[in-house]
């Protein structure tokens, strides 16, 4: 079942109840939904929704992957697929595709830990103009040993890093707070 505009709106609205100061940052998502834009496809509009996974291990470290296109370490995540059904499922699918981790993880909350709107440069090889991603990030914790098997077409490395290395201050603060609470 595809991710519906209603699901995206409900997820963003619930997120904004917990984080009302972020309403302006997410206005493009809400305006796109109000216009009836398809925010689920990678080739739609100046902004579309993506899903990301913040995976924390038993030691409190966060999994980063080296993204081949951007040539830097990022959190696992990517574009939505028709079969995802929910944004959390999309985040789990992306985690599994990029790292091979399909089991041994559990969400720490049914709500996103963070929604980050960021610019994506044009990709001439894929025929994609510059656009924005509204990356809906879910926080997961390992529930046992996990084995990483990279999707080498998109990913060329992985590292467990301290959550202190998360570049976004808001995400870093929320992940650190969740780790303290769940320990």
Regions found by a protein language model. Give the residues of each.
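Conserved Nudix-box catalytic region and its N-terminal flanking loop in Nudix hydrolases
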Residues: 60-101
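Acidic, metal-coordinating catalytic segment for phosphate/diphosphate chemistry
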Residues: 14-52
């Amino acid at each position: 079942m595809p991710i519906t505009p209603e699901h995206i709106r409900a997820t963003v609205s619930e997120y904004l109840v917990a984080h009302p100061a972020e309403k302006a940052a997410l206005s493009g998502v809400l305006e796109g939904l109000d216009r009836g834009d398809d925010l689920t496809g990678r080739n739609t509009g100046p902004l579309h929704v993506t899903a990301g996974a913040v995976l924390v291990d038993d030691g409190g470290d966060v999994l980063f992957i080296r993204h081949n296109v951007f040539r830097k370490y990022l959190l696992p995540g990517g574009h939505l697929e028709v079969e995802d059904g929910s944004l959390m499922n999309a985040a789990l699918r992306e985690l599994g595709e990029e790292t091979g981790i399909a089991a041994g993880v559990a969400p720490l909350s049914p709500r996103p830990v963070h929604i980050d709107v960021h610019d994506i440069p044009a990709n001439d090889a894929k025929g994609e103009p510059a656009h924005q991603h509204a990356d809906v990030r879910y926080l997961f914790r390992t529930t046992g040993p996990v084995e990483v098997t990279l999707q080498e077409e998109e990913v060329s490395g992985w590292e467990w890093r301290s959550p202190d290395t998360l570049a976004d201050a808001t995400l870093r603060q929320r992940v650190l707070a969740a780790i303290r609470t769940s320990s």
